[in-house]
Amino acid sequence: KEARVGIERRQIEEDTSKNIHTDSESLLNFNRASIPLIEIISKPEIKNQEEAYAYLTTLRERLKYTKISDVSMELGSLRCDANVSVRVKGDTELGTRTETKNLNSFKAVVRAIEYETARQIEIIENGGRIVQETRLWDEENGITRPMRSKEESMDYRYFPEPDLPRVHISENRLAAVEKEMPEFSEDKVVRFIAEYKIPEYDAGILSGEIELAAYYEKVTKTSGDAKLSSNWVLTEVLRILKEKNISIEEFSVSPE
């Protein structure tokens, strides 16, 4: 099943710090202070946690394949907040939303959305009212906790930076950029199946990371046996990468 999710806007910001929350305290990590970042605001068109996961993995792939970012949540180069709202079946307007932070993995995003959806449904079914607020994901207990109420929070009054000129992108420039786009994973899967005659499952794993896909193709070119190369990469190579906790770029065996 395919789903289409629009992007409301992208905005350039400057990183300030990273919040790290524990049961007893909240810490601030300033290691990334002043580093530029891009915030991508998605339209409220994601219907459930499964669609959210699919959207995030696709977005992460696009950002990595185009070398915009290494998109590592562990290193702080990718972060995600989840806005959740529910509505009674038949209603046309979205319900009051909450924003959940402290999500350190895509699996945490899925669990947080699932929990927050169930929490809001229970409140409404019991005659209660959803409060617009920011909540924190408690990974250990699998719940969200209130952080601050947005109904009482300061109005930051966002406005465009007047000292930065507007950038106008022409249709010709857009067309040129589209031609420079790399081959994304879904296209690689189709090509790997057709060209190398490997199963769809194998093609999906091999094309999941651009560096792994490139490594596999070099091994195949060297060995002359696409299936044997696929089996070796998927078993021996990935096993060693997992055991040593390294990336394919750090792997000591040359594909040639």
Listing of model-derived features with the role each one plays in the protein:
Residues 22, 28-45, 50-256:
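Charged, compositionally biased, marginally structured helical/coil segments
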